[in-house]
Amino acid sequence: MPPTIHRNLLSPELVQWALKIEKDSRLTARGALAVMSYAKTGRSPLDKRIVDTDDVRENVDWGKVNMKLSEESFARVRKIAKEFLDTREHLFVVDCFAGHDERYRLKVRVFTTRPYHALFMRDMLIVPTPEELATFGEPDYVIYNAGECKADPSIPGLTSTTCVALNFKTREQVILGTEYAGEMKKGILTVMFELMPQMNHLCMHASANVGKQGDVTVFFGLSGTGKTTLSADPHRNLIGDDEHVWTDRGVFNIEGGCYAKAIGLNPKTEKDIYDAVRFGAVAENCVLDKRTGEIDFYDESICKNTRVAYPLSHIEGALSKAIAGHPKNVIFLTNDAFGVMPPVARLTSAQAMFWFVMGYTANVPGVEAGGTRTARPIFSSCFGGPFLVRHATFYGEQLAEKMQKHNSRVWLLNTGYAGGRADRGAKRMPLRVTRAIIDAIHDGTLDRTEYEEYPGWACTSRSTSPKCRSIC
């Protein structure tokens, strides 16, 4: 018997279905949908595959990040997913857009058995108007999310019962063996990392905001370095928190929502994000008080990688059409695990390329399935290594060209640890200090001061200004 197909339900309808058919889904005290992704609470990078087709073979940087899957194996994986989806009682279909700049917008269609996943993608992508839905037509990319169904590890190219496969030729993503919703949004980011360079545009794993004078700041960084928190600035307008493209006209957000780490979320220092976790939002793997339904943002008993997803409309001052000009400031966020880096450093063009391609940060516990429980230094090219398709130097050259053309200033900001190692009890940089530094970047204070080379770090420099040092 074919499934009952629920096509493009509204968010309240998806919430109702989740409460009806998902045994562990419930509403929080403020109306967000609390859900579980079960066994996988983070991305599965070891199970990511890109299909080896003739149209992308020469472009892809094959290796540990981009592992090959043959077209024959992909066909078998796709068959498993489609057969599973076709035999469920309920099938949810979501049509959305990726990309606020309509010149480069993708039409995305998602098939999933979980209303939580459907609501997540409505939150994360751009929801069409009724008129746009009426003329949506065939999608540019299709996501078959059969995460409740396990993959067959005997299929050549697979090594486990999880598979997250992307086929650029057929324009499809297949998900098996993981119910972690983040795999869908990162799949779209990977697609853009291949499509945008074909038009000489830079895809960025970065957040962005814009000031009242139109000055744009882009924040590069891996999960947990502060992209979402720092871009949600009450004095500036949010463009987006994670995925952007820098074109010949400026910056646009790929997404229509935010996906924030929730562990340790403080309603006083991160009020914008806290207030966004209301009806229509998704609280993923968060622990609720059984009596009150309040989220305990400090409870790690399910996982460290607790998440909240919400539409941009939940953030006061966020741009509804998330497009802005060329960046005045580019900030690299690094979570230094050893406490040896300065709170902030200004970079020359050459230094910026070094740090961008190197992508030093620290592993944030819980972001990847099976990840370490303690912070350790890692190097993730372009501050987005897991999502790059081409070689890192390709994106580095793109960034250098754009920064030079538009005279962008570049900064390295340590949002990690100060005064010692993370695994020896050191405290993380206070958020108020980091925000004060960013304010000093935006008002020009850090740009109007003399700098000196930072001992032991020939590629960085720090301000000699007493005012700046008092902040840091």
From Swiss-Prot:
InterPro entries named in the record: PEP_carboxykinase_ATP, PEP_carboxykinase_C, PEP_carboxykinase_N, PEPCK_ATP_CS
Isomerase as UniProt keyword: no
Any one Gene Ontology BP term: gluconeogenesis
Keywords assigned: ATP-binding, Decarboxylase, Gluconeogenesis, Glycosome, Lyase, Nucleotide-binding, Peroxisome
Residues binding ATP: G221, L222, S223, G224, T225, G226, K227, T228
Domain of life per record: Eukaryota
Protein name, as recorded: Phosphoenolpyruvate carboxykinase (ATP), glycosomal
Provenance organism: Trypanosoma cruzi
Lineage: Eukaryota, Discoba, Euglenozoa, Kinetoplastea, Metakinetoplastina
